């Protein structure tokens, strides 16, 4: 589990794992007579962790893609999510084409990364011809706030939660996105 994927799975102020996916997993496993143990992992290594037997399954934030279907078995999805573009409110970025020449942050190993590469002409227009990769979305947002990147592309559920916890007036979510999952 990615323990930085708020509001789905994250650590509260006491260091306890909480969130929608945590509650759902406990309920599903409990109803079936199983005890669940959560294992935070490096998200960019999720398939390696699964294939090596270090974890038994991936519960949260694991989007279904054609490439991933070839590697793992999925259940039915329980959430639809978009890959949205977030900037600071005072940014002049208002469309995907405005990302040209800009530093765009994305979580490494995420389905967001897969989604943006479905539009290679957009990615090639980024500053340096590729996104700036971060281990967590939280780190990407911190660099946005510090002015080290110009935009973040992230799961809508995480981004809206993050923004709501901060000051929503400080951010802008573009109408265009990089697709749904």
Model-derived features with residue positions:
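Flexible hinge/capping segments at coil-to-helix
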Residues: 87-104
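Extracytoplasmic small-molecule ligand-binding "clamshell" domains
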Residues: 1-61, 133
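Solvent-exposed loop/turn segments at secondary-structure junctions
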Residues: 4-6, 43-45, 63-67, 91-93, ...
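Short beta-strand->loop
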Residues: 17, 102-109, 134
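Short, hydrophobic alpha-helical packing/hinge segments within bilobed ligand-binding/sensory domains
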Residues: 24-25, 46-49, 140-143, 149, ...
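Alpha-to-beta junction loops
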Residues: 34-35, 51-60, 102-103, 145-158, ...
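Periplasmic-binding protein-like
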Residues: 3, 79-87, 156-181
């Amino acid at each position: 589990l990615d323990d930085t994927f708020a509001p789905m799975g994250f650590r509260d102020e006491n260091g306890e794992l909480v969130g929608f996916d945590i509650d759902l997993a406990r309920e599903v496993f409990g109803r079936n007579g199983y005890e669940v143990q959560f294992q935070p992992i490096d998200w960019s290594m999720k398939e390696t962790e699964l294939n090596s037997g270090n974890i038994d399954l991936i519960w949260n934030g694991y989007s279904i893609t054609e490439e991933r279907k070839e590697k793992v078995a999925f259940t039915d999805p329980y959430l639809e999510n978009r890959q949205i573009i977030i900037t600071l409110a005072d940014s002049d970025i208002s469309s995907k084409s405005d990302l040209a020449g800009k530093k765009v942050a994305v979580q490494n190993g995420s389905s967001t990364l897969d989604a943006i590469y479905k539009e290679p002409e957009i990615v090639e227009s980024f500053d340096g011809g590729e996104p700036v990769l971060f281990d967590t979305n939280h780190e990407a947002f911190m660099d946005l706030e510090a002015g080290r990147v110009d935009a973040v592309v992230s799961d809508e559920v995480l981004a809206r939660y993050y923004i709501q916890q901060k000051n929503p007036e400080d951010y802008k979510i573009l109408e265009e996105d990089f697709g749904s999952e």
